[in-house]
């Protein structure tokens, strides 16, 4: 099945130029994956579903306002940010990752695909949010990272402006209870949790609204968000 057909099955409509950009992006990921660990998914049709559908289906569930700023925390090989950027060129993206090799690869992807209003930054989230350039500067923070919701919220919510949103792409929604207290401490409130399936796998989108500023002591350093979650 072609990528276009797969996307159509999930009600994701892209033009031919956008499809071509996604396919070129996949080729870049799979080529670099031969010398660097970017993804365990190397079969193309599976890549279409697990990376492209998984990233783009968010646009069917959440309405991002036009021309807004988004930071993707722990972006890895660029998911979900780069597919969303290809689909929604109006959005302005920052891709954050703590591994320099990955960030160098993402910069190459941005150049190869001629994407604009998008940058890749090499930094740890807990360091990045200590700077005025990044703290509470974004309309949205999105993440597909595997951390538990309480840990993820401590890394992500400090980036979000009051009135903005953190969007967490998770597995089953039964873990959201774990994060509720942390989210409140960090200035957020779970607005909704949307359950859905991708390729018969349970997924959930946790939408968190930033209702007040995050206290300056967060995020904590020294690995505390993971070792000792709020």
Curated annotation (Swiss-Prot):
**Keywords assigned by UniProt?**
Cytoplasm, Methyltransferase, rRNA processing, S-adenosyl-L-methionine, Transferase
UniProt-annotated binding residues for S-adenosyl-L-methionine: 74, 79, 125-126, 144
Q: Which residues form the signal peptide?
A: none
EC primary class? transferase
Q: Which family does it belong to?
A: Belongs to the methyltransferase superfamily. RNA methyltransferase RsmG family.
Reading the lineage from the top rank, the first entry is: Bacteria
Q: What is its EC number?
A: 2.1.1.-
One GO cellular component term noted in the UniProt record for this chain: cytosol
Name its species.
Finegoldia magna (strain ATCC 29328 / DSM 20472 / WAL 2508)
* Entry's Gene Ontology molecular function annotations: rRNA (guanine-N7-)-methyltransferase activity
Organism placement in taxonomy: Bacteria, Bacillati, Bacillota, Tissierellia, Tissierellales
Q: Has the keyword S-adenosyl-L-methionine been applied to this entry?
A: yes
Q: What is the gene name?
A: rsmG
What's the stated role of this polypeptide?
Specifically methylates the N7 position of a guanine in 16S rRNA.
Q: Where in the cell is it found?
A: Cytoplasm
Keyword Methyltransferase in record: yes
Name recorded for this polypeptide? Ribosomal RNA small subunit methyltransferase G
Which Pfam families does this one have? Answer: GidB (PF02527)
Task: Tell me the InterPro entries matching this sequence.
Answer: rRNA_ssu_MeTfrase_G (IPR003682), SAM-dependent_MTases_sf (IPR029063)
